[in-house]
Structures are given as structure tokens and as C-alpha cells.
């Protein structure tokens, strides 16, 4: 049945498996696909990515799950990694109802109710009837909300994590009620897989584990400590990527990425309300329905995710960072709860129970049938991808590639997500900021688009200074009539007459910025500085030094960055590339010191020479290698211990009367 459910979902959404650009232009799907392409070409997780955000460690790009899988398969199959990412993400999105079916079968032992729930999840999104903002967001294409966010916004990793979530919950229950080690290992692998795929799904999984423990508190035979052991083992399996520094970086960046979230008094009240509500729901089930543990578990998750999501959509308040994104989890458990309500009422059919089931069912069908009917009959014409060559983003990217830039490009809007999915071109921006160790270049990029901190008449001059300081050679500006979705320049005409126009495509323009090299000599007082009392960094001396002689040349050679030229006394070599402790620089046979300026870029203390070459190489850092070694030991040990299933102890078996799931039948 699970395979049949997947087949139905795949046939209903066959357009998701086709190559090309999705009809929605605000999708960030190609931002994820660009990572798959990068890891296909540069598989080392401890390398350096020079193509985005003025450079960052490969490990800090994003969570690797789907992207590394697509990159690995691309070495085995004659398919582009970007398209393989699409196929993987679409497959996992269509598998969602199948894992819901398995989840329901496991916990209720009733296949037909499980099938009904899975089909309901396939065809119906209750969120459209509950949240006006979500209802307006679907436009002229009818898809379940989980698939619409995949198509419209590119939420492939979130859908993948959502698909794995029911399986992980089954595995966690199994390991807490059964002493066999292989169950614990399976649970740990699933937990690690979700944590390496999507942060939102990982946090949702942690919340579900909490509600599971709350549901079965004081239940004989359920060993919560095994849940904790599975979590620790999962971290050991995943710590090769989820290093302490990586987690800390994500944690500190997340509030800024989530529209400047702050834990203020309002958020604290809502969090206390969430905790209190969970206790109330659990006590209500304890007093009214003490035997219905599965229904209690689903109700707790429905309340928890619903609390976070509905406060955001109804009042505009974020209980957690990016509260709106938990709508997928809320809808999943809310729909399961709806079918669980009907299942329990009709388990022992009586007149009152039948009445209480039939009336809500009529209202449910009245709300669901129009959307389901439209979904089944709409066809694929409006959903089919279009050839990428027809999109304005690809035309601009291809033109940039033909210019063969030696410096960076400044690409904003949707182009910054898509550019590196097609071409290896260094850019100021990229796909996702969550892994950035320093964010000051983002401030400069925002200044270029908006001119917000410039004085009267200084907007263009300040923007050009910022571009040159970041090593930009070409900038793409989207006009007010551009087909690009994110037209984010406050004044798209600001560079007319100030920069050389290289190319114009419809209402999109490419300008050349004065550029010599990604390395130049500066005196100490010419370095990049940002005085505390100033809204903008001090850029003019740094940029003026670029035009002075002697000039340096720079180029990438494989994984090395080479700088050549005359090194003058009392001068530093300024390199507008993100500073990281994993960099090493050698001038000849001698290692030279790497400094950091106020914007987080590198400066090299070169030795005076009429002609010299500096070779910079990125070797990673000790923490990354130590955590990788630890993870390898955990993987080897975890599978070696399969030979000794009693190593972690044999805990009491299942709770009496519960069968393989929570529901008493």
C-alpha cells in the first residue's frame, strides 16, 4: 500500500520530476542545487568555497544531506547534479504520505484508517481553510501546502525532513520499548539523517521526542534513557559536520536570518503559554481518555505546532525564529488528529458517536472536496517547468560567464541563488547566510542596493566604493520592469553614467566596476576600518590603494590562491576574502602571517621583494578534523557493536497491553 500511495503522489506531481525552471520565480531551489553542484566538483567537506559570500569553508555552506547525496549519485549516473537534486527532493516530497501511512499502521494497527489518512494527506490541506495568508499564497495552482512550498519556495530539504519524521518517531518508540541494539542504532541513524538535512525538521523532531516522553510519562516499560542514548549516538554519527562551532554559528545567525527575531517579553509569555498548554492537554487526556496514548501524542504535537504557527499568522508574532515554517508539521499532525477523531468515534458505533462523526465529516468534505477536485483535474500545463534558457536569470548568468570575470560579481535577488547552479563564478552573495562567520559584507551589500546610510548625493559613490572594496568586477541591476522576481534596488538607475554599461537584457543591466586584482598593497593606515561612531566603514583609503603602483596579480590555481608581484616594505597584501583560521600563506619557503581587518577580510604580512609569489592554501581547522575522527570512530563502533546486542543492556520489553504502538485497540 505504501508503494501505491507513493505512485499516486508521483503521478499527480509528475511535473516535479521534469528538468527546467519552476513556474514560480521566487523559488530558492537552485540555491540548494548549487551546493550539490559544488560538492560534485569539490567533494571535500573541509575545503573552501570561493564562489559565495567572499569565500567561506565548505562545511559552513549548509546542512549536507540532500546535496551530498545528489553529488554522490552524479558520479554514478549520467545526470547533472542540479537535476539529480531535483529528482531526490521531489521523490522524498512525494514519499511523505507513504511514511504517514506506515506511521499510522504502526501505532493503530488499522490499515484502512492509515490509508484514509495518507490519502487525505495526499489531497487535502486544511491550512488553506484556516489561514487566509496561506490561502492567498497558492495563486492559480492547486497543490497541497507541503508541495506548494516545495514548488514555490524551494523547500526541498524541509520536505525531506518531514518525510523522514514519522519513520524516526516509530524508530524512537521502538528503541524505547525494545531492548535490541539494532533498533537503537536505526533510530540514531534516522535522527542523524534528519539533523543533517534540515534544521526546522530537526527541531520539530526534538519537540516530538519531548511530547512522546510527556505522553508516556510513568508508563512501565518505556525507557526514556534509551531515547537520550539514541540522541547522543545520533550526534556522534553526525558530528563530522555538526561541529560545536558550526552549531554555535547557526544559532547566533538564526535570529538575524529570521527577520531579526528577539526573545523579548512577548516571546517569553508565548513560550510559557506553549508549555502550560502542553501540560493542560496531557492532563485532559489523563483524566478523560487515559488509554488513548497515541491520540494524546498527536494532540500534543498538533497543539504545539499550531500554537507557534497560528500566533504568527493571526497576530504576526514569532514565538520561535521563523515560526511560519512549522506550518508543515502543524498540518501533518492536525490532519492525523482529524482522522484519529473519526477512527475513535467509529470504533464502537453508537447513535451519538455516529452523529458526532457524520456532521464533522460533512463539513470536512465540504471544505476539502473543491480543493481536491481541482488538484485532481487541473492538469500540468501551468505546473510544467520551462527551459532554463528562457529565464532572465539564466540569460544574465550566461552573459556573466562569457565575460570571464577575474573578480567577483554582485548579483542580487533570485540570480544570486541560481548563479552557481550553472557557473562557477565568484559572487558577493549566495544562497544562505546561516553559516557565515562574519556578516559585515552583507551590510555592505545591503548598502549597495538601498543607499540607506549614505549622505545626500553620496549614494552612488558610496556604492561604488563598497563594490570595489569587496573585489567586484561586474554588478547586475534589475530594473522595475525586470522579469526577475526580487527587484531589490531602491534606485536601479544609480549607476547610469557612473559605471560602464556592458550589457542590457530587457530591463536588466550589467555594469563593469573598476577592478585590477583580488589582492593589492596597503599601508596599515589604509586597511579596512569601521569606526564605532560611523554608520559606514572607512573605505576610501583602501580603495585608493588599489589604483597605486606596483599592482599585484592574483588567480586561483586548483585549491590554491596565488598572488604575484613586487612586495614593498611597510606594506600589507590586502585580500578581500573572508578570514578563517584554516588558511596558510607561504612566500617562497617561509610561512607569513595572516591578519584580519575590521570587515573580516584577510591581510598578509609579506616580506619585501622585487618579485615574489605568495601561495595561499586552505587546510581546514583542528576542530573539524577532530570531530570527523570522532564521528568515524562512532560509526565504526556502532556497527561493530551489532555483534553484541546486549552491550547497552537489555531493558524491559514493551509496556503491557500496548502492542507495537501506543494505541490500545
Predicted features by range, described:
Residues 408, 474-476, 508-520, 572-574, ...:
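Ordered hydrophobic segments in well-structured contexts
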Amino acid at each position: 500500500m505504501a508503494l501505491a500511495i507513493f505512485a499516486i503522489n508521483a503521478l499527480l506531481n509528475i511535473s516535479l520530476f521534469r528538468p527546467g525552471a519552476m513556474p514560480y520565480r521566487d523559488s530558492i531551489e537552485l540555491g540548494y542545487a548549487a551546493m550539490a553542484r559544488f560538492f560534485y566538483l569539490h567533494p571535500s567537506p573541509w575545503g573552501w568555497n570561493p564562489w559565495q559570500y567572499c569565500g567561506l569553508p565548505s562545511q559552513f555552506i549548509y546542512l549536507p544531506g540532500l546535496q551530498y547525496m545528489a553529488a554522490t549519485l552524479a558520479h554514478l549516473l549520467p545526470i547533472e547534479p542540479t537535476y539529480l537534486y531535483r529528482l531526490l527532493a521531489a521523490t522524498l516530497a512525494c514519499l511523505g504520505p507513504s511514511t504517514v501511512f506506515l506511521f499510522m499502521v504502526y501505532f493503530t494497527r488499522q490499515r484502512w484508517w492509515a490509508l484514509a489518512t495518507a490519502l487525505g494527506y495526499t489531497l487535502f490541506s486544511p491550512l488553506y481553510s484556516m489561514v487566509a495568508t496561506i490561502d492567498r499564497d497558492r495563486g492559480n495552482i492547486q497543490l497541497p501546502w507541503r508541495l506548494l512550498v516545495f514548488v514555490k519556495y524551494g523547500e526541498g530539504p524541509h520536505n525531506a525532513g518531514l518525510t523522514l519524521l514519522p519513520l524516526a518517531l516509530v524508530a524512537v518508540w521502538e528503541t524505547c520499548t525494545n531492548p535490541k541494539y539494532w533498533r537503537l542504532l536505526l533510530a540514531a541513524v534516522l535522527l542523524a539523517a534528519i539533523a543533517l538535512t534540515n534544521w526546522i525538521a530537526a527541531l520539530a523532531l526534538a519537540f516530538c521526542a519531548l511530547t512522546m516522553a510527556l505522553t508516556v510519562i510513568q508508563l512501565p516499560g518505556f525507557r526514556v534513557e534509551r531515547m537520550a542514548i539514541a540522541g547522543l549516538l545520533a550526534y556522534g554519527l553526525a558530528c563530522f559536520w555538526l561541529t560545536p562551532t558550526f552549531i554555535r554559528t547557526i544559532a547566533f545567525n538564526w535570529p538575524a536570518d529570521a527577520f531579526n527575531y528577539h526573545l523579548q517579553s512577548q516571546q517569553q509569555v508565548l513560550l510559557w503559554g506553549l508549555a502550560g498548554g502542553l501540560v493542560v492537554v496531557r492532563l485532559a487526556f489523563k483524566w478523560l481518555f487515559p488509554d488513548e496514548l497515541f491520540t494524546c501524542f498527536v494532540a500534543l504535537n498538533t497543539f504545539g505546532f499550531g500554537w507557534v504557527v497560528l500566533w504568527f499568522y493571526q497576530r504576526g508574532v514569532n514565538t520561535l525564529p521563523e515560526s511560519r515554517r512549522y506550518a508543515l508539521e502543524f498540518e501533518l499532525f492536525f490532519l492525523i488528529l482529524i482522522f484519529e477523531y473519526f477512527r475513535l468515534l467509529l470504533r464502537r458505533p453508537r447513535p451519538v458517536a455516529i452523529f458526532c462523526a457524520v456532521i464533522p465529516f460533512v463539513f470536512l468534505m465540504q471544505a476539502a472536496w473543491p480543493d481536491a477536485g481541482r488538484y485532481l483535474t487541473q492538469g500540468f500545463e501551468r505546473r510544467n517547468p520551462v527551459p532554463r534558457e528562457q529565464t532572465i536569470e539564466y540569460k544574465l548568468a550566461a552573459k556573466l560567464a562569457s565575460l570571464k570575470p577575474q573578480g567577483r560579481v554582485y548579483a542580487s535577488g533570485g540570480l544570486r541563488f541560481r548563479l552557481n547552479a550553472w557557473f562557477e563564478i565568484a559572487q558577493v552573495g549566495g544562497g544562505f547566510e546561516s553559516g557565515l562567520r562574519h556578516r559585515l559584507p552583507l551590510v555592505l551589500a545591503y548598502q549597495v542596493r538601498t543607499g540607506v546610510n549614505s549622505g545626500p548625493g553620496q549614494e552612488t559613490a558610496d556604492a561604488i566604493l563598497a563594490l570595489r572594496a569587496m573585489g567586484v568586477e561586474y554588478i547586475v541591476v534589475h530594473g522595475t520592469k525586470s522579469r526577475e522576481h526580487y527587484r531589490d534596488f531602491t534606485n536601479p538607475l544609480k549607476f547610469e553614467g557612473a559605471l560602464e554599461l556592458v550589457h542590457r537584457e530587457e530591463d536588466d543591466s550589467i555594469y563593469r566596476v573598476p577592478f585590477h586584482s583580488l589582492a593589492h598593497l596597503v599601508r596599515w593606515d589604509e586597511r579596512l576600518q569601521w569606526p564605532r561612531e560611523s554608520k559606514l566603514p572607512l573605505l576610501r583609503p583602501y580603495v585608493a590603494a588599489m589604483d597605486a603602483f606596483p599592482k599585484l596579480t592574483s588567480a586561483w590555481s586548483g585549491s590554491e590562491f596565488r598572488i604575484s608581484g613586487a612586495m614593498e616594505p611597510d606594506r600589507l597584501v590586502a585580500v578581500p576574502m573572508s578570514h578563517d583560521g584554516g588558511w596558510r600563506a607561504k612566500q617562497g619557503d617561509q610561512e607569513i602571517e595572516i591578519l584580519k581587518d575590521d570587515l573580516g577580510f584577510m591581510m598578509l604580512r609579506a616580506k619585501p621583494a622585487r618579485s615574489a609569489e605568495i601561495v595561499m592554501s586552505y587546510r581546514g581547522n583542528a576542530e573539524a578534523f577532530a570531530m570527523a575522527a570522532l564521528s568515524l570512530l562512532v560509526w565504526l563502533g556502532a556497527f561493530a557493536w551489532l555483534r553484541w546486542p546486549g552491550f547497552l543492556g537489555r531493558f524491559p520489553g514493551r509496556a503491557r497491553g500496548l502492542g507495537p504502538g501506543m494505541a490500545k485497540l
